[in-house]
Amino acid sequence: MSSLEQLKATGTVVVSDTGDFESIAKYKPQDATTNPSLILAASKKPQYAALVDAAVDYAKAKGGSINSQIEIAFDRLLIEFGTKILAIVPGRVSTEVDARYSFDTQTTIEKARHLIKLYEAEGIGRERVLIKIASTYEGIQAAKQLEEEGIHCNLTLLFSFVQAVACAEANVTLISPFVGRILDFYKAKNNRDYTAQEDPGVVSVSNIFNYYKKFGYKTIVMGASFRNVGEIKELAGVDFLTISPALLEQLNNSTDAVPKKLDASKASSLNLEKVSYLTDEPKFRFDFNNDEMAVVKLSTGIAAFAKDADTLRTILKAKLEA
């Protein structure tokens, strides 16, 4: 049995992390996740030119100013990719709200509702879509409101326990705690390597998983952003893992053992203290601000996603003006 099959056998749901949907079918993932960087990368590939053209044609038909058409084409392109992905995976696709709205609760809510409307116009129900939102205080508040409306959310760029606690209290459907980016920070800061067992990203996700299970939170923990298969194996048994096609391929080609490492039933006996952040913004900000890694990684993550979204807009603008 391949390492990938063994991972699935531990109870972990495997998700594909890519916009390049042609590369995922053979791994039989349950869900797929996208982000602006992945959509940008896929949009540059010749085999996806038709999707970009379809989004541009859709925006041209809607008319309006060039800036208005760019926004229409941008949102439409997310739906074009999402729709194609949902023809391959049986579960859900995650589609991200523009990172520039990461500190704007109301606009995030409005964008999410709009994306869901676009999907529903294509005959895709909201139960098959997760709206990805950065795990800022404002983003978590937006997600709380959206979940109450039946719009399911994936809270991303999650680097700290503080963010994770607030997300659980907001009853969000799923969180994406990043593993590899946490490792990147500590490797650079401390100028050393880490084994998979001591990997700070692995430790972070394990702690969040155990806290959620101990206190009965329903929010799904989906580890994300991996640098190697060692990190993935250390999280076997976690609810979900979203994995790039390159690492899925490594797992598929390996027969190394993948024993279950995380077990919800064992969390109940752990001596953990319950804390609260959702309705205490000063406490959230103070405790989050005391985690240098989380502050740096959230900031650079939002900036990088926003930059790639702007690059995508530039590509769409050129096509709209052609």
UniProtKB/Swiss-Prot annotation:
The keyword Metal-binding does not apply. It comes from the Eukaryota. Keywords: Pentose shunt, Phosphoprotein, Schiff base, Transferase. One of its GO terms (cellular component) is nucleus. It is an enzyme of class 2 (transferase). InterPro entries: Aldolase_TIM (IPR013785), TAL/FSA (IPR001585), Transaldolase_1 (IPR004730), Transaldolase_AS (IPR018225). The active site is at 132 (schiff-base intermediate with substrate). It catalyses: D-sedoheptulose 7-phosphate + D-glyceraldehyde 3-phosphate = D-erythrose 4-phosphate + beta-D-fructose 6-phosphate. Belongs to the transaldolase family. Type 1 subfamily. This is Transaldolase. It comes from Schizosaccharomyces pombe (strain 972 / ATCC 24843).
